Amino acid sequence: MSNKFFTFLIMGVAASGKTTIAEKLAEKINSFLIEGDDYHTKENIYKMSSGVPLNDSDRYEWLIKIKNEILKRNKKQNLVVTCSALKEKYRTLLGPQNFNLVYLKVSKKTAHQRIRSRQGHFMPDSLVDSQFAILEEPQKSIVLDESLNTNEMVKKLVSIYKSTYQ
């Protein structure tokens, strides 16, 4: 009998809560966390830190690195992956749709407020609008909006995991 492993891809604009949710979820379901921000090139981090939005070609190498990490691990262990994945073509590039796509939906106002309060992150508040401008909301996903608190979101995802995997 072959092992079946589960992958959550958590997407959304900057400051939607991807890392916060992913860290808690990965711990709850004993999964390996792939934090998309860790795969950005130095050039991309510099560009974003300077207030310049990334374009499709800037994102390509980053998305390929995340995809390769997923492919390296998804046959061996459960995964929780964070990636803004703002466009459908980015999500398609990440690989076959054999992951559970989670869209963290927040308003521009909430994203701006959260990003202003966060410390030590390269993404400035000035780039929030550019992320919303290119966002293509997914047609098929688990949508969690800002009306839920972190614990409620994680609880929902754990429930989906248990009902699907166990």
Descriptions of predicted regions:
Residues 15:
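Walker A (P-loop) phosphate-binding loop of P-loop NTPases
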Residues 117-160:
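Small-molecule kinase domains that catalyze NTP-dependent phosphoryl transfer to phosphate-bearing small molecules
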Residues 1-5:
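Phosphate-binding P-loop
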Residues 18:
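Conserved lysine of the Walker
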Residues 95-114:
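Conserved phosphate-donor/acceptor-positioning beta-strand/loop module used by diverse small-molecule
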Residues 23-65:
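Conserved substrate/cofactor phosphate-moiety recognition/catalytic segment
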Residues 76-79:
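Loop/turn-to-beta-strand initiation segments
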Residues 10:
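Hydrophobic anchor at the beta1->P-loop junction of P-loop NTPases
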